[in-house]
């Protein structure tokens, strides 16, 4: 059996420690600003803080771009030439052309050497699937068995983020000016739900942001009996007021602290959601009705 290489795109938002521990290879998406002629690589040539600084400097939000077909071919080739098999997952096909581009690129190599799994998710919703891949790889499963097993988890991933401001969604064309105004005036904090290969607004929470964080914790506790607690992610973007610690402290009363992974959202998630975005992500045992 060939050695299996697990590859994720940068939107999986895995921490450097997890990338090293699980031996994950990461290929970056692109980030561009309309006023600049620079093609940044997510997490390589631009960080989330640098992105936010540029938003203030330029007065515009960036655009994220998929990994193109040739980039995938160039990235896959050394591993295939070394006799390895590859399994790749990244941001869902309903949110980016990255998965489709990876699929096209995989056809340039011998059949059966590369498996592409559509996460139908983003951020550490994808990251949860990456960790599953790594664990199955370490059990000695081949690339096809890993892909078959991980696809069973795709509809079970629970990905929800509470956002503090609609400014980034508005500038990115994902909400109208009236909704943005109402959010500002009435302190509305939408919960973004990633489901069925897309993003939608679930609940809209009213009041202080801390209250919205409490609602996320309550949902976590409610889901506990139906949750795979081996890996739970708390993923945030520029939360400077301790919301991340608040959530981790609360979750650690119910599950071992070592099962909670605190990571920071990369530039692609920051592009659409903005600062003070935070989510609790986990895999359910059975799908929500």
Residues covered by each model-derived region:
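Mixed-charge interfacial surface used for oligomerization/domain docking
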Residues: 11-19, 25-32, 37-38, 84, ...
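Class I S-adenosyl-L-methionine
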Residues: 38-88, 93-111
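Polar/charged alpha-helical tracts
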Residues: 20-21, 53, 70, 74, ...
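Short catalytic-loop micro-motif centered on adjacent basic/acidic residues
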Residues: 6-7, 63, 88, 116, ...
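N-terminal glycine-rich anion-binding loop in soluble enzyme alpha/beta folds
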Residues: 5-65
């Amino acid at each position: 059996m060939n050695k299996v290489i697990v590859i994720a795109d940068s939107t999986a938002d895995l921490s450097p420690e997890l990338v090293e521990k699980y031996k994950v290879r990461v290929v970056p998406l692109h980030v561009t600003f309309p006023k600049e002629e620079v093609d940044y690589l997510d997490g390589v040539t631009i960080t989330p803080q640098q992105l936010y600084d540029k938003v203030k400097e330029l007065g515009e939000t960036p655009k994220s771009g998929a990994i193109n077909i040739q980039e995938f071919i160039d990235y896959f080739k050394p591993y295939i030439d070394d006799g390895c098999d590859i399994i790749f997952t990244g941001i869902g096909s309903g949110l980016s052309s990255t998965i489709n581009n990876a699929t096209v690129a995989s056809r340039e190599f011998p059949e059966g050497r590369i498996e592409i799994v559509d996460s139908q998710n983003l951020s550490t919703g994808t990251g949860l699937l990456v960790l599953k891949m790594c664990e199955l790889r370490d059990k000695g499963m081949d690339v096809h068995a890993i892909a078959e097993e991980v696809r069973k988890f795709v509809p079970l991933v629970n990905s929800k983020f509470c956002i503090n401001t609609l400014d980034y969604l508005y500038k990115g064309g994902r909400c109208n000016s009236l909704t943005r105004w109402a959010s500002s005036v009435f302190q509305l904090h939408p919960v973004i739900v990633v489901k069925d290969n897309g993003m939608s607004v679930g609940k809209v929470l009213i009041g202080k942001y801390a209250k919205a964080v409490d609602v996320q914790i309550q949902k976590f506790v409610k889901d506990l009996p139906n949750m795979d607690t081996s890996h739970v992610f708390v993923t945030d973007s520029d939360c400077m007021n301790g919301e991340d610690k608040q959530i981790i402290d609360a979750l650690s009363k119910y599950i071992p602290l070592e099962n909670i992974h605190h990571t920071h959202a990369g530039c692609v998630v920051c592009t659409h959601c903005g600062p003070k975005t935070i989510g609790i992500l986990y895999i359910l045992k059975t799908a929500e009705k």
